Amino acid sequence: MPELPEVETVRRGLAPAMVGARVARVTLRRPNLRFPFPERFAERLEGTTVLELARRAKYLTAHLDSGESLILHLGMSGRFDVRLPDGSNLSPGDFYLEGALGTPKHDHVVMAFANGATVTYNDARRFGFMDLVATRDLETCRHFASMGVEPLSDALDAPLLARLFARKITPLKAALLDQRLIAGLGNIYVCEALHRSGLHPALPAGALAKPDGSPAPKAKTLVKEIKAVLTEAVAAGGSTLRDYARPDGERGAFQHGFRVYDRVGHACPTKGCTGRVGRIVQGGRSTFFCETCQVLPVR
C-alpha cells in the first residue's frame, strides 16, 4: 500500500492537471471500487472546478467550488494516468503495475477536464475508493474524524509524542502505525525512522515519556528522524517496490536509500556498528531492524 511519500508524490503529479480546471465529463466503467460510488457521483462532479488538491495522511482530497470535496484513496494498487492533449504524461506521481495489472481493463474512472487534460483511475485489486463529502465536514467525516496528527506538520513534536505514548505498553512500532495517533505513517518509513533513532521496534511506546509525562530524550530524536525520512522520501519521488513509479515512467528512488527495510542479512549501515539487519513479525507485518544497535533494554 502506498504510504505518505507516495501519496504526496501522486498529489504533486495530479495538481497541474486538476487544480483550477473544470470537470467536463466523468465516465464510470463499473458501479463500485472497494465501496459503491456515492449517489449521482458523476453528475455531482461534472461542471465543478477543482479549487485545491490536498493530502490528509494517505488520502487525497480535491476541494470543489460546489462546496463538496472528492476524497480519493489508492488502496493497494490504485494509480492515476494523467495525459495532456498532446499525449504527454505529467510528473511526478503515478503508480506503475507490472504486467496485466496496469492494463486498460482496470481503468475504472475517467475524468475529462475542460482544459483538455484527462485523469484516469486504474485499480487492478479495487481496494481503493472515492467519496464525496461537504468540504465543511471534512475533518469530522467518517474517513478523517478519528485521525491523528500529520507527521510532517509542526504539531508533531517531542512533547506531543510523549503525551500520545505516555503509559502505553504497546510496542513502539505498533503505536507509530496507529492512525488514530499519527496519521500517514506506514511500515517502510517506520522501520527506517526507528533504525535511524536507535530504537527497538518492540520497545514499549511509553518509554518515550518520563514519569511526569515530559518527553524522554529519544522522543525528540524519533520525531526528527520521522520528519527526515518522510521529507527525503518525498524528494526522491517515493519508493518503488512492486507497484509504484512516477507518472513520467521513472520509478521512485528512495528504496535505494533503505537502511534496513527488506535488507535481512545485510550489514547495518550505521557507522561503527558491526551488526546485521534482522526481521521479526509484528501484527502480521515484517519489521526490519539492526540486531546490534537497536537493542531492547533489559527490564
Swiss-Prot record:
Keyword Zinc-finger attributed: yes
**Biological process according to GO:** base-excision repair
Question: Which Gene Ontology molecular function entries are recorded, alphabetically?
Answer: 8-oxo-7,8-dihydroguanine DNA N-glycosylase activity; class I DNA-(apurinic or apyrimidinic site) endonuclease activity; damaged DNA binding; zinc ion binding
What does the UniProt keyword field contain?
A: DNA damage, DNA repair, DNA-binding, Glycosidase, Hydrolase, Lyase, Metal-binding, Multifunctional enzyme, Zinc, Zinc-finger
The EC number of this protein is 3.2.2.23, 4.2.99.18
Q: How does it assemble?
A: Monomer.
Function field: Involved in base excision repair of DNA damaged by oxidation or by mutagenic agents. Acts as a DNA glycosylase that recognizes and removes damaged bases. Has a preference for oxidized purines, such as 7,8-dihydro-8-oxoguanine (8-oxoG). Has AP (apurinic/apyrimidinic) lyase activity and introduces nicks in the DNA strand. Cleaves the DNA backbone by beta-delta elimination to generate a single-strand break at the site of the removed base with both 3'- and 5'-phosphates.
* Protein name per the record: Formamidopyrimidine-DNA glycosylase
Q: Which organism is it from?
A: Methylorubrum extorquens (strain CM4 / NCIMB 13688) (Methylobacterium extorquens)
